[in-house]
Amino acid sequence: MSHGYRRFLASILLVDLVLAAGAGCQRAARKSGSFPASGEVSGWTKTGDTRTFDATNLWRYIDGDAERYLKAGVQSVSTCDYKYEGKTDAVADVYTMTSAEGAGKIFESEPQRNAKPVTMGDDARLYGQSLVFRKGRYLTRIVAYNESPEVQPAILALGRAMAERLEK
């Protein structure tokens, strides 16, 4: 094998490695970027940093309900605070499960009373001031801290923006 040919093969291998690494970084960025920045969704402002709790310290965030998520295979939850039009506080949570079945198990265990099915992700329910949906191995919950006529369309818009960012 000539020196020039070896150099050619090494160049191709290097290009393949760079492309593969870039694809991996894009997937990681997409997952960590599931929370829209301020102004990306009309009326919504991100009011704090994203916090993440892994399975070992999930109880610090959802004390009393962590066991249900652990049994369903939760890996972590990321959470972020928002404010809608300067007056309605809300929190958005993205639970990363080991499988889509785990996300489905938690989704199906949620109460269906007073819920309206909506088209988002694989399955979604809209309540008076909250939205829960699942997409692949992710379960997302958005809760607004007051109820008003504009809250439901607002959390639907935020939810759709988040669903677009989640991998299938």
Q: Predicted regions span which residues?
A:
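Residue-level signal for helical boundary/lining positions with a hydrophobic bias
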Residues: P36-G39, Y95, F133
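Post-signal peptide N-terminal segment of secreted/secretory-pathway proteins
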Residues: S78-K83, K87-P111
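Bacterial N-terminal signal peptides
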Residues: S11-A20
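Structural recognition of the beta-strand scaffold that forms the well-ordered cores
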Residues: V132, L139-I142
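Short, internal acidic amphipathic alpha-helical interface segments
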Residues: A100-K135
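Solvent-exposed loop/turn segments at secondary-structure junctions
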Residues: T98-G102, R125-L126, L139, N146-E150
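N-terminal "mature-domain start" segment
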Residues: G24-T88, R113-P117, L139, E147-K168
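Bacterial N-terminal signal peptides that target proteins for export
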Residues: S2-I12
